[in-house]
């Protein structure tokens, strides 16, 4: 039976700005909705669009474009200091309030989205029911050191080409871009050619890299922005909701990168997708969605109004 999606889009006012969002499914279904936080920082919802499949289970799915990206307000003239973790935490809380789901929701954060989701979950918000960090760092220094290790395993000459242009600051040189793409094809998305929604996200980052450059850097693995010293290690034990860690066998988020989630969070489980890198939701879409739905059904199975009554 084909699932006919109920979809609505809108904008949440965030101060003087607008946050675009999309709801797939019914927020009044009684089942905990899932908020999907995209990566970057500076990407868009497009490449994580596949998580809309979860709505067929009865859990409504909310996608949104973070400020500065996609269909939300762009601010290319803002100083890099404007773009902070705190800003994006405020935007997330504002969206939860706008959708009137702040008393009952789950979060799935992919890559940077899982970093932001971790910061949110560490604060123990009363309505958070479950947390899914997908392919996410816990320490940017570990992330970079693991990326450097993976780079050295790429075909001969790729790592050396990357080093040469990073030293020179020539990040737009076609040679650097081609070498970067080799890393991406091994450790970011192994589907060839890239699905249209993945290519669309990268095209939008290229069109306005304001947030990506300010907080991360020119590539996934050369982190020189404001997040370069970020870490959640030592704070993750504050996360007090059931947690599902997702990663891929070929992921730039290596087992060493995600290990602190498993070490520090009390109620945690790990799904490792053998044929995926950084995007199991694209590379093993059906299996990934099934894993997410099974987890949500297990940990959010009791209707929220029953919990409240108890």
From Swiss-Prot:
Chain's role: Hydrolyzes L-prolinamide, L-proline-p-nitroanilide, L-alaninamide, L-methioninamide, piperidine-2-carboxamide and piperazine-2-carboxamide. Has a much lower activity towards piperazine-2-tert-butylcarboxamide. Does not hydrolyze dipeptides and D-prolinamide.
Top-rank EC class of the record's enzyme: hydrolase
Keyword line: Hydrolase
Keyword Hydrolase found: yes
Pfam families per the UniProt record, alphabetical: Abhydrolase_1
GO terms, biological process: proteolysis
Activity regulation details: Completely inhibited by ZnSO(4), ZnCl(2), AgNO(3), CdCl(2) and HgCl(2). Partially inhibited by PbCl(2), NiCl(2) and CoCl(2). Unaffected by LiBr, H(2)BO(3), NaCl, MgSO(4), AlCl(3), KCl, CaCl(2), CrCl(3), MnCl(2), FeSO(4), Fe(NH(4))(2)(SO(4))(2), CuSO(4), RbCl, Na(2)MoO(4), (NH(4))(6)Mo(7)O(24), SnCl(2), CsCl and BaCl(2). Completely inhibited by phenylhydrazine, but not by the other carbonyl reagents hydroxylamine, hydrazine, D,L-penicillamine and D-cycloserine. Unaffected by the chelating agents o-phenanthroline, 8-hydroxyquinoline, enthylenediaminetetraacetic acid and alpha,alpha'-dipyridyl.
Source organism superkingdom: Bacteria
GO CC, any one term: membrane
Active site per the UniProt annotation: 111 (nucleophile), 251, 278 (proton donor)
This enzyme's EC code(s): 3.5.1.101
InterPro entries xrefs: AB_hydrolase_1, AB_hydrolase_fold, AB_hydrolase_sf, Peptidase_S33, Pro_imino_pep
Name of the featured protein: L-amino acid amidase
Gene3D superfamilies from the UniProt entry: alpha/beta hydrolase
Keyword Transferase attributed: no
Sections of the chain in a coiled coil: none
Reaction(s) catalysed by this chain's protein: (S)-piperazine-2-carboxamide + H2O = (S)-piperazine-2-carboxylate + NH4(+); L-prolinamide + H2O = L-proline + NH4(+)
Residue ranges annotated for the AB hydrolase-1 domain, each copy included: 33-284
Molecular function GO terms recorded: peptidase activity
SUPFAM superfamilies per the UniProt record, alphabetical: alpha/beta-Hydrolases
